[in-house]
Amino acid sequence: MLTDNNTELLLPFVQEENICLPLPINVVSKYWDVELPIMEAKEISKLYPNNFGSIMIEGIELAERNGLECKIIHSSIPELKKIIDSGIPPIVILPGIPEITQHASVIFGYNENENTLLHYIQKGTKEGEQQEGAIPIPIFDKEWVQDGRLTIILAPPEIVSSLKINKKTEEESNRLCFISEKFSIQKNYLQASEFARKAIELDKNNSTALNLLGGLLNSQNSDECVRYYQESLKQNNKNYLSYSGLGNFFLKTNQIEKAIDCYNRAIEINPKRSARIYKNRAYLFEKQKMNSKAKEDLKNYLKLSPHANDRGIIEQAIREL
């Protein structure tokens, strides 16, 4: 549906998903009347035992094997509207809830009068009708920018080409990031690092790739991670994961003031994205004898993670501070 002030695409109601066929990929594929084989996705998922998060690249490649084309870009609000106006429901990468790092959401419309975007919500009704959530564009963009405004365009090849989005190097670099994440989930950190480095070679300004390599180096306790996190923040100073990653590295290396500063900056960007960041900062405050601040952070940790396994220990620590 298209009017002067809004566009709204009609998406199918979908419930079936798998870690290798994430719901947004399945929804958009069905929108194009492409039925993706769930059994193939289930077979691929055996490569990821004990993993509960979505492997987006597996869903993308499954869709591509069934005739759709994909572009992964860093976008903008005007471009997002252009994509929707072209009849394509874009998939955007947004911050997750604690402690889910990220989640993908399908945007299927916008309303200029209300300055909102419409995103698909997985909620069943007896009628199976489409569920929607309206989010004010300024609030959406504040969240979206934290992960570089990553956007997945999935459509038949002729429709993708009609968009005339010419970001070939960026697209290839972003795809390599998604492949790197796949290997990281498989705990193949050597391959993950290789693909992240290739992504940076293609696009040295790709904040997603720079943060990704920073995280991989951080997991190896390499101080080289600092440079990549800092480069990521030069490209996107709202990159929450780079600030929190830097904070974690400085915590491990006992650089207390630097760690607190990075955690502060991450929390300023998004105070509800992570519970663990409050527990980490509380530990640092306690080391600096800032007990009231430590106590407040532990309360925030429990507020964001009410079912934390260490709840009893944390409650005891709060009483003792």
Protein language model annotation of sequence segments:
Residues 110-202, 207-211:
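Noncatalytic regulatory segments and standalone regulatory/sensor domains
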Residues 199, 231-232, 265-267, 300-301:
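Canonical positions in the second alpha-helix
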Residues 176, 183, 195, 210-217, ...:
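TPR/Sel1-like alpha-solenoid repeat signature
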Residues 202, 235, 269-270, 304:
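Structural marker of alpha-solenoid helical repeat scaffolds
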Residues 220-222:
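Glycine-centered coil turns and helix-coil junctions that link the paired helices
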Residues 1-52, 96, 113, 173-183, ...:
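Active-site-adjacent structural segments surrounding the nucleophilic cysteine of cysteine proteases
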Residues 1-11, 29-31, 36-155:
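Conserved active-site-adjacent core of cysteine acyl-enzyme catalytic domains
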